[in-house]
């Protein structure tokens, strides 16, 4: 894909139940509102999406209850990648709907990165011996480099499989890195983080992306700039301090895009509020995007939602109410971006 900025995408998760009908509905809606690179609707938790199928083929990895995982011993990396059905869904859907395929520039897949996956796996007693507790109250796999490295190898093969499907943007979502890297790094070295991320991304030959939530420290920014990632994807609406962290030269000197979160995804209920009360107006979004253009340059920007919308399912009593908020936010984001092209 040539260097062309100011295209639109989204992070992935949507606030509706994980059904085939909802997958079809959400993907179609993303295309029809004008998202340039729609992501497959991520309708299950980002960690169990990969850890659950892995627990069925990695014997020491157990899912003791839904979304709770324990590792008890060393393990062999599986021979075949797991969780490919989401990419296959997009490929098959667009084959069946060529009219919709003609309306988009490409597709996006959201995968979960090795550090974040490892942070969600608890260690059994044998593996946790001698490890000091930091950040977490329990021993977790992220504290052991060899486990993180194995997860990177696993995600590399999943990324390669998605790349081979022809998916254009493939993101390794790594929200835990915002906690891991502040003024200093917990558990690992800078070189290990760069090497591990590059390994996880190495199967992706199109547009590898990394999504990290929250405030980005200058140290984390500099680490990510040294990786092979092409798109650095961060929250700006919720964490406006990130405007002070990134400069245009960071992107141009390192040949990166900045995916700028433009609509807020972390919401609190307001008494008596309707759907539109939660949705940013087009004029507001035009001004917000213009701020990014002035700072970073139109050709260096990707416009997207702050994070995924999946958490809204718990924020509001009605799934349909939450879903309409998400879709209307994205629609206004697209309209604002098109007016600034």
Task: Give, region by region, the residue ranges found by the protein language model.
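Domain-level signal for soluble alpha/beta catalytic cores
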Residues: 1-341
